[in-house]
């Protein structure tokens, strides 16, 4: 590990990666100190730049994701472009209001003081992106970072190399390159950047790496936002519209070959409707795959091996085929695998979907709450009370009734995990807040300047002060 001599003046190190990280952060810090990123106009220009980047260069983005992930242009538009534009437009619309200081009251003892709080940028921050939605999940956090007036280093995932190269090329073209930098590379450069004592690290990725990021940030007391994964469950009760449930679950699982952090990981289906539901699910999957190749490509050989490893020893209800040459796996449904099988342990993150029979909603909730708190939890039911039970009895990042993943697309809602699925939240105003410090300000008048406030305190002074407090 390399160290940097002084946070504000100079950097000396022998490792070229560490030198690049140190020089970049030093340069951005100097820019931040000039106040360049503070005005509303600068922030708005960056947000407009992000919108222009993804809309004007949509075809280049789509080509990159076809190469990295085997995605169709439509999936790129839906998953990475429309989602980014929605976030940026919302921030543009509300930013002026978010930046205004908010007046608050004061207790009697502080009257007639004037109290307020305002959002102050943290300084120079680091956004570490994953490979599964490489544009939305780097530009989305960047929207929060620039809206809040920060300088930012973006570190895209090396596992989506074409997308990483596009970001490195286009971000300087569309955004202020004095204040926003892209550094490509793997874990080493990430660690070297963290060693620069960033003012915040915003990480999206898996839980294990998230822990390493938090550990690396701890010695510097760098705050972290961790957007992690987990096993997001879906309950289907006997009161569900089974056709709608099957279509929406199939849609959520097939999107990006199941490599979506809020994809359905496993289903908990009431026994009395499981056969009928499984038939609907099979039909929905085959209808949605009409005209598409039998198997879905996954990101790389390592993920392919991990996923096919999960299939070993299971008896698929549908699917189960895989092709190593094209690193593609057929969407696969497995009914009632052993709960100790690997497929029911870690996050699946691929086109494999286990269904577990449950006796009741109580049973389903008990199973979910035995595990770590998931990033998302879903229920399909027409019963208001059943929906309310999921919302109130299952601790998780976010909960949705009768759909999959749609909460992600509402900038009016905070998005983030809890426990092993993450800490901190973003989207909309929460993104702006995540990259800001809430600074308290209190303006006191010089008069009156009551003697009773200062020692020595007479009996009478003490009585009055106790009444005022
Ligand atoms: P990952 O954890 O492998 O990597 C993410 C980033 O961390 C990459 O940029 C990588 O270079 C960097 N990295 C890897 N090892 C590192 C180390 N030792 N030190 C420092 N940096 C390191 O995640 P991934 O495989 O790209 O993404 C998949 C995971 O992300 C899944 O678990 C998924 O659920 C989760 N995810 C969460 C969200 C969310 O919003 N909560 C969104 C998408 C994906």
Regions found by a protein language model. Give the residues of each.
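N-terminal Rossmann-like NAD(P)+-binding subdomain of aldehyde/semialdehyde dehydrogenases
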Residues: 1-116
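Conserved C-terminal structural/oligomerization subdomain of aldehyde/semialdehyde dehydrogenase
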Residues: 2-3, 7-9, 38-39, 235, ...
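ALDH superfamily catalytic-core signature
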Residues: 11, 15, 175, 208-338, ...
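Residues at or immediately preceding the N-termini of alpha-helices
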Residues: 21, 40, 58, 242, ...
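Structural signal for hydrophobic packing residues in well-ordered secondary-structure cores
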Residues: 32, 36, 51-54, 58, ...
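Residue-level signal for inorganic ion chemistry
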Residues: 43, 88, 149, 180, ...
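Short loop/edge segments at beta-strand edges and connector loops
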Residues: 99, 184, 205, 318-320
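Rossmann-like NAD(P) dinucleotide-binding subdomain of oxidoreductase/dehydrogenase enzymes
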Residues: 107-244, 358
């Amino acid at each position: 590990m390399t160290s940097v001599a002084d946070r504000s003046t100079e950097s000396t190190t022998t490792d070229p990666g560490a030198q690049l990280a140190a020089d970049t952060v030093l340069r951005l810090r100097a820019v931040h100190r000039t106040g360049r990123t503070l005005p509303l106009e600068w922030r708005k220009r960056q947000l407009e730049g992000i919108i222009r980047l993804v809309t004007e260069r949509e075809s280049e983005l789509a080509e990159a994701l076809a190469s990295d992930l085997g995605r169709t242009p439509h999936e790129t538009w839906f998953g990475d472009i429309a989602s980014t534009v929605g976030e940026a437009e919302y921030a543009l619309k509300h930013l002026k209001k978010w930046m205004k200081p908010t007046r608050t009251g004061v207790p009697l003892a502080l009257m007639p003081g004037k109290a307020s709080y305002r959002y102050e940028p943290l300084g120079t921050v680091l956004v570490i992106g994953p490979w599964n939605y490489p544009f939305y999940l780097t530009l989305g956090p960047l929207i929060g970072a620039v809206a809040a007036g920060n300088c930012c280093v973006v570190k895209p995932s090396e596992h989506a190399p074409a997308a990483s190269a596009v970001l490195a090329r286009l971000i300087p073209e569309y955004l202020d390159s004095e204040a926003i930098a892209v550094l490509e590379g793997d874990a080493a450069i990430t660690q070297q950047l963290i060693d620069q004592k960033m003012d915040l690290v915003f990480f999206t990725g898996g839980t294990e790496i998230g822990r390493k990021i938090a550990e690396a940030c701890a010695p510097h007391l760098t705050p972290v936002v961790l957007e992690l994964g987990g096993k997001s469950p879906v309950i289907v009760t006997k009161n569900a519209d089974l056709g709608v449930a099957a279509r929406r679950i199939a849609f959520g699982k097939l999107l990006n070959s199941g490599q979506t952090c809020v994809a359905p990981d496993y289903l908990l289906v009431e026994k009395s409707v499981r056969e009928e539901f499984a038939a609907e699910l099979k039909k929905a999957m085959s209808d949605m795959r009409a005209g598409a190749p039998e198997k879905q490509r996954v990101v790389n050989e390592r993920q392919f091996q991990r996923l096919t490893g999960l299939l070993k020893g299971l008896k698929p209800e549908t699917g189960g085929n895989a092709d190593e040459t094209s690193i593609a796996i057929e969407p696969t449904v497995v009914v009632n695998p052993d709960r100790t099988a690997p497929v029911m342990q870690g996050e699946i993150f691929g086109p494999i979907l286990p269904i577990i029979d449950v006796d009741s909603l109580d049973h389903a909730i008990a199973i979910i709450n035995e595990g770590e708190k998931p990033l998302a939890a879903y229920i399909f039911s027409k019963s208001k009370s059943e929906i309310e039970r999921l919302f109130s009895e299952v601790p998780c990042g976010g909960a949705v009734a009768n759909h999959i993943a749609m909460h992600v697309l509402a900038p009016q809602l905070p998005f983030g995990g809890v426990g092993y699925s993450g800490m901190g939240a973003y989207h909309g105003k929460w993104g702006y807040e995540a990259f800001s410090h809430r600074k308290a300000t209190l303006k006191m008048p010089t008069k009156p300047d009551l003697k009773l406030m200062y020692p020595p305190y007479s009996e009478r002074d003490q009585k009055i002060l106790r009444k005022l407090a």
